[in-house]
Amino acid sequence: MTSQSQNIVETPSRVRAHALGINAPELAQYQDEPAQMRSGAVGKSGYLKLRFAKREHRSILAEMERRVPSMVQKALYWDEEMPELPCVTMISTSGCILQGDRLATDVIVEAGACAHVTTQSATKVHMMNANYASQIQNFTVEEGGYLEFMPDPLIPHRNSRFITDTTINIHPTATAIYSEVLMSGRKYHHADERFGFDVYSSRVAAHVFLGKEQPAGKELFVEKYVLEPKSESLDAIGVMQSFDAFGNVILLTPKQHHERILARVPAHFDIKGGIASGATRLPNDCGLVFKALGIDSAGVKNEIRQFWKIAREEILGVTLPEKFLWR
């Protein structure tokens, strides 16, 4: 057994990343291996572990483990509204997601700690002629913890296939904001790029955190959607209609915050302005879900930022810092 194989076997999330998609019906016809480099080979089996812990005056990135192509910058404290908040930017040394990639991420926020995790830019899923790419994301937020996971959009290129599975284990007193933005593709690059991908499969689930080394507790909710635009048009009313960007935000937080947040987030539909958004409750009183549609990423990101701002203000009593010009 190679050192890479040994490391994969010893890391449950990496094992899941390599297995994810093998038995997925939506990927049944994409099990062929790439001619260049086999799936999950060295450089194609990325792993990132981030563990945040509370110290006297602030939280810190206490542990970081990575395997190429995944890496992160050091924790920075650029949020002037929350100077105790470590902000970490995830980076891919390959610059994109390629066919045969198997990626896994573990983020742990210990009791009383806080963290903000983002990406340096949009994530591109490149064109594929064999196999697919898979991603496992595990988030654990312990008692009184606070996590913001706010990556930039994901852009699936023509003929790409991508499957992602996200699990959030959260203590009843903790808060987690999980965001994702999906684009229709590189619609200005080529006529066949808009909804030109083969498969985009996403599953997000949450469980009650029972403690370290303990199995996951009660399942709070599961959301899964499989997009196959070449089989069924996404331009239908009730799906994407004329929109090109989809934003999905999961807010898991104690019940006492829900009503105040919802009162400040009315449904918004402006077909001329190219934006639609709204929020509702998740099952088991575990939190809220916010969704937005737009003609471009800027509009959707603005809607998400407003929801994020309201959530922060109602939960923590602090707002967001001024938006960076380059973001």
Swiss-Prot record:
Compartments in which it is found: Cytoplasm
Chain segments annotated as coiled-coil in the UniProt record: none
Record-linked InterPro entries: UreD
GO cellular component: cytoplasm
One MF term in the entry's GO annotations: nickel cation binding
Subunit structure: UreD, UreF and UreG form a complex that acts as a GTP-hydrolysis-dependent molecular chaperone, activating the urease apoprotein by helping to assemble the nickel containing metallocenter of UreC. The UreE protein probably delivers the nickel.
Protein name (Swiss-Prot/TrEMBL): Urease accessory protein UreD
Biological source species: Yersinia enterocolitica serotype O:8 / biotype 1B (strain NCTC 13174 / 8081)
High-level lineage: Bacteria, Pseudomonadati, Pseudomonadota, Gammaproteobacteria, Enterobacterales
